[in-house]
């Protein structure tokens, strides 16, 4: 007797479907709900007398009185701490993974005004080993909040970083705190005063067993073009023609690595270095006599973007508390439709063959 197997790709008729359903129901009658669900949760729809397990009658009111106790929490899934088999993509180490821009008020020590409470944007990241699926991001915030009531310094940042490394079982970590730092400044001649705000970031990095303390500061100043100044004077002297040199708002981002045993480098110290190097800082409160004084100050300190980088460099080199550093300057031209930029680094910390494509656009302060 010859038996011919039915082609599985052949379209079944109703009789075939009835036979298949009978077989399925006989199997399901002996199987558990878990076995049925593992095969296909939709099978429950075909079984007489059973509830639709994939369409439960869910509660729709928020349970205010529900207690997520310890035993309940132990049942919650934790995918980020799952096995390496859950990793998607290449099983490679990730140098930085964490959270950016969580904000809270933080108190800081200052050189001249005691302690200040400032709104601070915090970024915390850790390294992730190749065989680990991920990290629990909330642990970074919880670790940081343990120290949030303290008056912050690099020593407190060190303690927070230690908690990151311990809580997340990582080898490397980075903590950055970014804020706007107010300093009261005097006008040039009128005696008025107002607050100048400086974008400051503190960064603590542990990498390959080494720990680095870094301060970033944006300094905003006016730059008068030396060439334009001379051309304007030539027009006046040679032809009696009134002319004005072009000047523009300019920004330098100063990044310095602090020497471990060099003592405290205050925010105000770094600002003072910038003012001595390039004294044409933009003004806060201005009357006519201040505006005239600022014109005279710019004429006495004309500066190309190359000059700016070297003058800031000279000021930083004079401070034993400063190790490696980088100066990024941007003169946002009033003559040209492009900007003039320069980058000067000293040491290996900030040396890089590639620059962030958006680096110079971040130096445009929009308020």
Curated annotation (Swiss-Prot):
Keyword Oxidoreductase: no
Site residues by UniProt (May be catalytically important): 225
Entry keyword set: Hydrolase
Keyword field contains Calcium: no
GO biological process, any: tetrahydrofolate biosynthetic process
InterPro entries: GTP_cyclohydrolase_FolE2, GTP_cyclohydrolase_FolE2/MptA
E.C. no: 3.5.4.16
Pathway the protein contributes to: Cofactor biosynthesis; 7,8-dihydroneopterin triphosphate biosynthesis; 7,8-dihydroneopterin triphosphate from GTP: step 1/1
Catalytic activity of the protein: GTP + H2O = 7,8-dihydroneopterin 3'-triphosphate + formate + H(+)
MF terms (GO), sorted A to Z: GTP cyclohydrolase I activity
TM annotation in the entry: none
Protein function: Converts GTP to 7,8-dihydroneopterin triphosphate.
Database matches in NCBIfam families: PRK13674.1-1
Family, per entry: Belongs to the GTP cyclohydrolase IV family.
Record's protein name: GTP cyclohydrolase FolE2
Organism: Ruegeria sp. (strain TM1040)
Encoding gene per record: folE2
């Amino acid at each position: 007797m010859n038996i011919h197997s039915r082609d599985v790709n052949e379209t079944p008729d109703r009789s075939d479907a009835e036979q298949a359903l009978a077989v399925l129901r006989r199997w399901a009658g002996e199987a558990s709900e878990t076995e049925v669900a593992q095969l296909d949760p939709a099978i429950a729809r075909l079984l007489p007398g059973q509830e639709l397990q994939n369409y439960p009658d869910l509660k729709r009111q928020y349970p205010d009185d529900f207690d997520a106790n310890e035993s309940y929490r132990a049942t919650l899934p934790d995918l980020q701490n799952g096995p390496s088999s859950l990793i998607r993509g290449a099983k490679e180490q990730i140098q930085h993974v964490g959270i950016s821009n969580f904000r809270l008020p933080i108190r800081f020590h200052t050189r001249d005004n005691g302690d200040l409470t400032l709104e601070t944007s915090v970024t915390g990241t850790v390294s992730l080993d190749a065989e680990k699926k991920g990290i629990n991001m909330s642990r970074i915030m919880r670790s940081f909040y343990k120290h949030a009531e303290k008056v912050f310094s690099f020593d407190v940042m060190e303690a927070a970083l230690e908690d990151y490394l311990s809580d997340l079982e990582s080898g490397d970590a980075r903590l950055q705190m970014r804020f706007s730092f107010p300093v009261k400044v005097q006008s040039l001649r009128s005696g008025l005063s107002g607050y100048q705000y400086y974008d400051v970031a503190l960064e603590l990095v542990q990498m390959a067993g080494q720990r680095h303390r870094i301060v970033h500061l944006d300094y905003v100043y006016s730059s008068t073009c030396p060439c334009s100044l001379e051309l304007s004077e030539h027009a006046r002297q040679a032809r009696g023609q009134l002319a004005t040199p072009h000047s523009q708002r300019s920004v330098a981002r100063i990044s310095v690595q602090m020497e471990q045993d060099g003592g405290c480098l205050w925010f105000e110290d770094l600002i003072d270095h910038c003012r001595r190097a390039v004294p044409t800082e933009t003004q806060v409160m201005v009357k006519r006599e201040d505006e005239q004084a600022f014109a005279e100050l710019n004429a006495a300190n004309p500066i190309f973007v190359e000059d700016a980088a070297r003058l800031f460099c000279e000021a930083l080199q004079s401070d034993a508390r400063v190790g490696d550093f980088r100066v990024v300057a941007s003169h946002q031209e009033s003559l040209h439709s492009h900007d003039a930029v320069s980058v000067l680094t000293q040491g290996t910390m900030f040396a890089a063959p590639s620059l962030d494509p958006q680096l110079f656009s971040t130096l445009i302060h929009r308020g």
